[in-house]
From Swiss-Prot:
Location of the region described as Disordered in the Swiss-Prot/TrEMBL record: 43-69
Subcellular location(s) of the protein: Secreted, Cell wall
Catalytic activity: (1,4-alpha-D-galacturonosyl)n+m + H2O = (1,4-alpha-D-galacturonosyl)n + (1,4-alpha-D-galacturonosyl)m
Domain of life: Eukaryota
Secretion signal span: 1-21
Catalytic class of the enzyme: hydrolase
Tissue distribution of the protein: Expressed predominantly in roots with lower expression levels in rosette leaves, flower buds and siliques. Bearly detected in seeds. Found in flowers undergoing floral organ abscission. Also expressed early in anther development, at the time of microspore separation.
Gene name as annotated: QRT2
Segments annotated as PbH1 repeats: 201-250, 251-272, 304-325, 333-354
Protein name listed in UniProt: Polygalacturonase QRT2
Function: Polygalacturonase required for cell type-specific pectin degradation to separate microspores. Involved in anther dehiscence and floral organ abscission.
Cross-referenced PANTHER family: PTHR31375
Active-site feature positions: 265 (proton donor), 288
A Pfam family the protein falls into: Glyco_hydro_28
Organism: Arabidopsis thaliana (Mouse-ear cress)
């Protein structure tokens, strides 16, 4: 009996402290967020009140050790009257970034703020920055005021950041789109700003935000780690040029979940350096589908691995799930799963193209290619807008390897009949019911 008590005591003393110390940060944060302190803070944020009420008590009746500090952009001079509010936002950011503990930056609801190009830089002293966008942030309309044409709103080198609130970010893309060479081939091909870019941000969550009418791409994660992008609405017209919805570059451990993307380019694009990417619960269309690539442009080296796309619905897109690489590239795209996907009137539901070329002039034929391997298509069904629903255009010299299809059924939308497959230089394995089949 005593021996059992001793053993139990040793267990409690040894393991319980480590359990509490390793309790996930986001769970602790969820506990904080459920308290009365958060409810009151959140309620006052939306209406634009400053919140520094240290006397508030949580639901258990105990005063918190320290209340989060809140920095309202209006307090720093934002007017939301059609003039430039960039300086006020920057001042609010600098105050929050230089503070310790948990801090809020608040853009209240029922306000429409105009911003020129801004960069919110770290590193910051705060343990967590929560950027609450309740209102609407709109891009400055004069392109000549953009010193650097490729970015509008940038978060750079910021750890432990959350951007949320249910508000809108509008890129005013209608000013930029007519200047694109894809709209007017007589014009030079110049870049336009990405609406929101996160660069080298770790432990990042972007949620409950609507991004619309981006100048070019809507949302980019570049060289980030441990990212969650949740409950996003990304929209722009189907004919808006290069308006990718969510672009992932050089980023590891990212979850994109429960989001709707309707754009003029890829709904989600995943390019070199990205690893451990999961996209689930995605509704895509119009747009160019969910793409890995393009990879290997200009004979470059590219690597993408461990990608899972599941529980997606694609509606009227020009592609479904796509892997695209340029001739002449090097590297690999491997360990990729597309599963539990519904296609509705999609032009190329399943496609691998190692002969991708997005140029006016023809691309030269080259022997090297990015290796595509270990790709699984599972539980995919729906309709194709063209007779060919499955297309594998793989390299003669570096063919696609380890491509598997399981329980795939795609029919021709125009004929309501069995569709066709076009396959070249691919080593394919099929299981279960697969239609169409490569011949």
């Amino acid at each position: 009996m005593y021996e059992k008590i001793i053993i139990l005591s040793v267990f409690l003393l040894t393991f319980l402290p480590s359990c509490f110390s390793s309790y996930p940060f986001n769970h602790r944060d969820d506990l904080f967020m459920s308290s009365n302190v958060y409810y009151e803070t959140n309620r006052q944020h939306q209406h634009g009140h400053n919140t520094r009420n240290s006397h508030l008590k949580n639901r258990h009746g105990y005063a918190p050790r320290s209340s989060p500090r809140s920095f309202n952009v209006n307090t720093f001079g934002a007017k939301a009257n059609g003039n430039d509010d960039s300086k006020a936002f920057m001042k609010a950011w600098e105050a929050a970034c230089s503070s310790t503990g948990i801090v809020y930056i608040v853009a209240p609801k029922n306000r429409d703020y105009m911003l020129k190009a801004v960069t919110f830089s770290g590193p910051c002293k705060s343990s967590l920055i929560i950027f609450k966008i309740y209102g609407r942030i709109e891009a400055w309309e004069n392109p000549s005021d953009y010193k650097e044409r490729r970015h509008w709103i940038v978060f750079e080198n910021v750890n432990n950041l959350r951007v949320e609130g249910g508000g809108r970010i509008d890129g005013n893309g209608h000013i930029w789109w007519p200047k694109s060479c894809k709209i007017n081939p007589q014009l030079p091909c110049l870049g336009a700003p990405t609406a929101v870019t996160f660069v080298e941000c770790n432990n990042l969550r972007v949620s409950n935000i609507r991004l619309e009418n981006a100048q070019q791409m809507h949302l980019t994660f570049q060289d980030c780690k441990n990212v969650k992008a949740l409950n996003l609405m990304v929209t722009s017209p189907a004919d808006s040029p290069n308006t990718d919805g969510i672009h992932v570059s050089g980023t590891q451990n990212i979850l994109i979940q429960d989001s709707i993307v309707r754009t003029g380019d890829d709904c989600i694009s995943i390019v070199s350096g990205s690893e451990n990417v999961r996209a689930t619960g995605i509704t895509c269309g119009p747009g160019h589908g969910i793409s890995i690539g393009s990879l290997g442009e200009d004979n470059s080296e590219a690597y993408v691995s461990n990608v899972v796309v599941n529980k997606a619905t694609l509606i009227g897109t020009t592609n479904g799930v796509r892997i695209k690489t340029w001739q002449g590239g090097h590297g690999m795209a491997k360990n990729i799963i597309f599963q539990d996907i519904i296609m509705k009137n999609v032009t190329n539901p399943i496609i691998i193209n190692q002969d991708y070329c997005d140029r006016v002039e023809a691309c030269p034929e080259q022997k090297s290619a990015v290796q595509v391997s270990n790709v699984l298509y599972k539980n995919i069904q729906g309709t194709s807008s063209r007779p060919i629903a499955v297309k594998f255009v793989c390299s003669k010299n570096i063919p696609c390897r380890g491509i598997s299809m399981q329980n795939v059924k795609l029919v021709d939308q125009t004929q309501q009949d069995v569709s066709k497959a076009s396959c070249s230089n691919v080593k394919l394995d099929t299981r279960g019911n697969v239609s169409p089949l490569c011949t």
